[in-house]
Structures are given as structure tokens and as C-alpha cells.
Design a protein with these regions (language model features):
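Signature of uroporphyrinogen-III synthase
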Residues: 1-117
Length: 117
């Protein structure tokens, strides 16, 4: 099988190596460029949970002012891995898609606790 990866190398490298080791032909043609955007300052104390839909969100987020024990919902294992590397401790992880993430949030977060970001 020939597999084409279009994400930036740092987001694809692990899978590229894995598929090559399995004997597949792999090409890398990055057509997606991920860049930081400026955003309004966020008071993280206003939130009881954070939803991360991408490891890239964590890559560009200033995490110094965030309590690392806050509940974090992660879309998949790559996002979870990035959150762990930044010191987050209270992670709930879906199976890699938004539909599963939504169900996980509905099952595990009581909105009476406060707001989510």
C-alpha cells in the first residue's frame, strides 16, 4: 500500500516510521501549514475544564498560567501525549474523533461545576 501524509512532518513522523516498518511505501507532502494565531488573553481561572481538539492547540497555548490539575478533554492519543508532556494530569481522552469526544464530555462533565473552554 502507498500512503500519503499531508500534515507537517512533526505531526506525521511517528506514523510515517510505523507504516514504513510495516512494509508500506510512504510519501510525505505537507500541504497543511499550522501557525500560531494571536488571541485575546484568557483567564483560565474562569474555567473548570478545557477541551483540546488538537495537539496543535496545545503547541501554541501559553500553559504557564493554567492549573495542571484542571480537567482536560483530549480528542485522541496524540493530543493526550502532548498534554502530558506539558504537565497536565487530569486527562480524559476520546478515540480520535469529535463525535466520541462529545459523548465523553457529556458522560464525564457536570455543567453545574462551571464553564468549559
Amino acid at each position: 500500500m502507498h500512503i500519503l501524509f499531508t500534515r507537517p512532518l512533526e505531526d506525521s513522523e511517528e506514523l510515517i516510521l510505523k507504516f514504513r516498518d510495516l512494509g508500506h511505501k510512504v510519501s510525505h507532502m505537507p500541504v497543511i501549514q499550522i501557525e500560531k494565531v494571536e488571541y485575546e488573553k484568557i483567564n483560565f481561572l474562569d474555567y473548570k475544564a478545557i477541551i483540546f481538539t488538537s495537539a496543535n492547540a496545545l503547541k501554541f497555548l501559553d500553559t504557564k498560567l493554567i492549573d495542571k490539575k484542571i480537567i482536560c478533554f483530549c480528542v485522541g492519543s496524540a493530543t493526550e501525549k502532548k498534554a502530558l508532556s506539558l504537565g497536565f494530569q487530569n486527562l480524559i481522552t476520546a478515540e480520535g474523533n469529535v463525535r466520541n469526544l462529545k459523548e465523553l464530555i457529556l458522560q464525564n462533565f457536570n455543567s453545574s461545576l462551571g464553564k468549559m473552554l
